């Protein structure tokens, strides 16, 4: 089950808009904070926050049945 869950999550993340996906991966998989992600991508911290929020909304919509588990695992 765990492998299937992570596979579905990875596929859903790959479908995120490019900039949103970059921010999401940097913050949630690479452990960067908002400031570091903003510096790396040369965007504002507010843009990082907005992209993270947008990514979570898209994933929540696309993975409704699994979202509570993702929220628990990743603190979304």
Predicted segments, located by residue:
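Acidic, proline/glycine-rich intrinsically disordered inter-domain spacer in sigma factors
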Residues: 1-11
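Substrate-agnostic recognition of the 12-TM MFS/MFS-like secondary transporter fold
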Residues: 3, 28-29
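Helix-turn-helix DNA-binding module
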Residues: 11-14, 18-22, 30-47
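Membrane-interacting alpha-helical segments
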Residues: 46-49, 63
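Residues within the DNA-recognition helix of helix-turn-helix
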Residues: 51-54
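C-terminal edge and immediately downstream basic/flexible tail or linker adjoining helix-turn-helix-like DNA-binding
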Residues: 56-76
